[in-house]
Amino acid sequence: MAIVKVKPTSPGRRAMVKVVNKNLHQGKPFAALLDSQSSTAGRNNNGRITTRHKGGGHKQHYRIVDFRRTKDGIPAKVERLEYDPNRSANIALVLYADGERRYIIAPKGLTVGQQLMSGSEAPIRAGNTLPIRNIPVGTTIHCIEMLPGKGAQMARSAGTSAMLLAREGVYAQVRLRSGEIRRVHIECRATIGEVGNEEHSLRQIGKAGANRWRGIRPTVRGVAMNPVDHPHGGGEGKTAAGRDPVSPWGTPAKGYRTRSNKRTTTMIVQRRHKR
């Protein structure tokens, strides 16, 4: 994997920085593990915008990724590493000994030909998936389940990981990348190591058009709008917002907590916020 600063042949390429991985598969993805997905452009079933700044972009196939890793005791060989347009991490196509192929999130250091295993008897090696009760305390993990059998939901993006801090009864404590410490049932599964493509955050897209390829539309500032459109809008000429930053609906925009899921609050041992 290499970081390439593009030659400034145009204003759009002057600031562009790419992450190039020559180990990625250059051909088409595995067709049996593809699914079609239609773009909603941020609209709901009534056609109204529910998520702003979405629309357009290149059409993509969804790669069906195995987040459960339940084929216990069956060794799998990594056939190839692939780019996935739906996530920041790369994915790996693995071939199980029984002939089945599946996509998984590619951990850091994974190579073509490497053997992987899942289940309680799997060795503690990067890419192997085990129940948390079988993972030593202090191990770096990723792709962590929040409920047993539901599939990995935490620590899935490029370069992320978590650390197993302790086990107490039927729960374990896991420190996430944000600093949050969370309780997870020991029967939940996690994968050893950290997610690969850790240099993803160093890329510079260079031009607005690259965001349009990704289906991201422009974000208009509130102070550039009219009062009917935004609390920051209006005024003669260029003016400041005149109040603390808020969303178009008046919700504080800087540091205001919006989490409302009280049902799982008891699973959070330490919040990620400093205050």
Swiss-Prot record:
The keyword ATP-binding does not apply. PROSITE patterns: RIBOSOMAL_L2. Keywords: Ribonucleoprotein, Ribosomal protein, RNA-binding, rRNA-binding. InterPro entries: NA-bd_OB-fold, Rib_uL2_dom2, Ribosomal_uL2, Ribosomal_uL2_bac/org-type, Ribosomal_uL2_C, Ribosomal_uL2_CS, Ribosomal_uL2_dom3, Ribosomal_uL2_RNA-bd_dom. GO terms for molecular function: rRNA binding; structural constituent of ribosome; transferase activity. It holds the Pfam family Ribosomal_L2. Residues 50-59 have a biased composition (Basic residues). One of its GO terms (cellular component) is large ribosomal subunit. The keyword DNA-binding does not apply. Residues 35-59, 224-275 are annotated as: Disordered. Residues 35-49 have a biased composition (Polar residues). GO terms for biological process: cytoplasmic translation. One of the primary rRNA binding proteins. Required for association of the 30S and 50S subunits to form the 70S ribosome, for tRNA binding and peptide bond formation. It has been suggested to have peptidyltransferase activity; this is somewhat controversial. Makes several contacts with the 16S rRNA in the 70S ribosome. Part of the 50S ribosomal subunit. Forms a bridge to the 30S subunit in the 70S ribosome. Belongs to the universal ribosomal protein uL2 family. This is Large ribosomal subunit protein uL2. It comes from Burkholderia orbicola (strain MC0-3). The gene is rplB.
